[in-house]
């Protein structure tokens, strides 16, 4: 879809605003780091526990992917006839229509073929 003049203008104005406000934003971020860096880190330590790298990797290995389900690669249906959860409804509807279209083709009786 083509970009409208309005969207181009808005993008241009946002870029100029970013340029104008960049020094103020930088100073604000630096002041946050200067004043409360130690205080913020203490709060984070209270909330979160720091784990060694080995333990973190071991915990990640426990996760299982959903590979137990047998899925048809062509139709993306699993053994229960369900589509994957990430597929949106329009895509499901389209695939279902294609599947049913193939089933509806009626065969001509043997005697009537000219």
UniProtKB/Swiss-Prot annotation:
Region: Disordered, residue numbers: 1-23, 91-114
PANTHER family assigned: PROTEIN LLP HOMOLOG
A molecular-function term among this protein's GO annotations: basal RNA polymerase II transcription machinery binding
Highest taxon listed in the record's lineage: Eukaryota
Entry keywords, A to Z: Chromosome, Nucleus
Its biological purpose: Regulates dendritic and spine growth and synaptic transmission.
Transmembrane segments: none
Gene symbol of the encoding locus: LLPH
Stated name of the protein: Protein LLP homolog
Annotated family: Belongs to the learning-associated protein family.
Subcellular localization(s) per the UniProt record: Nucleus, Nucleolus; Chromosome
UniProt keyword Nucleus present: yes
Any one cellular-component term (Gene Ontology): nucleolus
UniProt biased composition (Basic residues): 1-21, 91-108
GO biological process: dendrite extension; positive regulation of dendritic spine development
